Amino acid sequence: MNRRRFLKSSMAVAAVCGTSGVASLFSQAAFAEDAGIADGQTRRFDYTVLQAMAHDLARQPWGGAPRDLPPTLANLTPQAYNSIQYDANHSLWNNIEERKLDIQFFHVGMGFRRRVRMFSLDAATQQAREIHFRPELFKYNDAGVDTRQLEGQSDLGFAGFRVFKAPELARRDIVAFLGASYFRAVDSTYQYGLSARGLAVDTFTDTPEEFPDFTSFWFETVKGDATVFTVYALLDSPSITGAYKFTIHCQDTQVIMDVENHLYARKDIKQLGIAPMTSMFSCGNNERRMCDTIHPQIHDSDRLSMWLGNGEWVCRPLNNPQKLQFNAFQDKNPRGFGLLQLDRDFSHYQDVMGWYNKRPSLWVEPRNQWGKGAVSLMEIPTTGETLDNIVCFWQPEKAVKAGDELDFRYRLYWSAQPPVSTPLARVLATRTGMGGFPEGWAPGEHYPDKWARRFAIDFVGGDLKAAAPRGIEPVITLSSGEAKQIEILYVEPFDGYRILFDWYPTSDSTDPVEMRLFLRCQGEAISETWLYQYFPPAPDKRNYVDDRIMK
């Protein structure tokens, strides 16, 4: 699977991409003093122009993979690439007094081979100027770049851009677009985590996955006191093109992005992913197979949360399975979904490098009717934390045919907590472990006669306390096996209730077991729905190992 080579750390490297369709629309002109670093000829631009460009581009053959970079850039190591810094004195809005926002660009090089074009846009006059690459925009430090190979290469473009906000102008970025159509943002912690993408194509099909590129960006010039800005993007790939409009709100505690896109299919597409996001889950409370480190948990996100079109709230803890898993949760006009990192307790991670307790959640809020489809979740086996292994997106039910035009509007919230949550009791944590014995009597001299797996699901909030005197009933549904030893315990430290049950196999099958649980009081649901996928061991592994040496 090419994805493994594509996803590095938590920011993707663009490896298989296409070229921009705007090469003939803008030409270089003499440097204009009033345009800051923009040195291109002025041309009219607005969102309707971009839509026409994407529409026309879809009716042309795809331009192919990126052209080769000069060897001094193509052969950079990650360490050398990271040492290249943009010169803050040449930032996009450096000439705006008392500005609250600013833009800097990423250098092409290493795996970032796509030559992305950047334009400065005066929204009042609808005039855009290109910003051409030139070495003096960067500080190469000890990267070992032979700048002689870069002379006269104004068409090198850039790899992407990042956004800074006062009072951390030029010091700590809060938004980054880099690699294919990947982008990220932070909350008040300034800690990056999971990524979003402009579009996903054939992520889980019998054809190779396609990674569309943002090939050009247009930045509306901001006013000095603005904390909101608009950037437009052209997306291109072998199968589809797109016109994107991002309105990005850089708030104190979160970043909110209003996204609007118009998509134009070049070819039939088996699987289209809208509002895709990419994260990492190595191990957690519920999955400790790969946790032989000093860190109790390692993950960018701990769950998929869904607010279905019918109003039901669903919590699906993430897994690091032994083999790739793909699940589609059918829905109609979803109200929202996201990959969340709700456990913010440092002691649960003990990580002073990754700071997983500070990583943001990402919530998608559709802003128009998305119709029938599914929230799709792919979980890929991983042995550590340096490869993103979680993918989530909305997949429309209707197949995409060549010539189709689609449009989607949605809002992305990058924040510690999602903007909405269920008024019912919600899942706090999920734990699994050895079963088959009474809670509080972990096996000592004798293991249980029958093998079982225990599940503990903690619920908090809602009307749990009011419902307790009237009786709380766990409603458990399993695709196979039996649930026994079901218990409900009040847990004072988190002021909630723990639901315990042991899963007993009723066959030798190792197929995933789909589990579903919610709480009910006098016939009425009082909690969100917990979904889980458990992978039972082979029959010969269903035993308890006693490795004590007593001699």
Curated annotation (Swiss-Prot):
It comes from the Bacteria. GO terms for cellular component: outer membrane-bounded periplasmic space. Pfam families: MdoG. Predicted to be exported by the Tat system. The position of the signal peptide cleavage has not been experimentally proven. PROSITE patterns: TAT (PS51318). Its main location: periplasm. Keywords: Periplasm, Signal. GO terms for biological process: beta-glucan biosynthetic process. It is found in: Periplasm. The keyword Signal applies. Pathway: Glycan metabolism; osmoregulated periplasmic glucan (OPG) biosynthesis. One of its GO terms (molecular function) is catalytic activity. Residues 1-32 form the signal peptide. Belongs to the OpgD/OpgG family. Probably involved in the control of the structural glucose backbone of osmoregulated periplasmic glucans (OPGs). PANTHER family: GLUCANS BIOSYNTHESIS PROTEIN (PTHR30504), GLUCANS BIOSYNTHESIS PROTEIN D (PTHR30504:SF3). This is Glucans biosynthesis protein D. It comes from Klebsiella pneumoniae (strain 342).
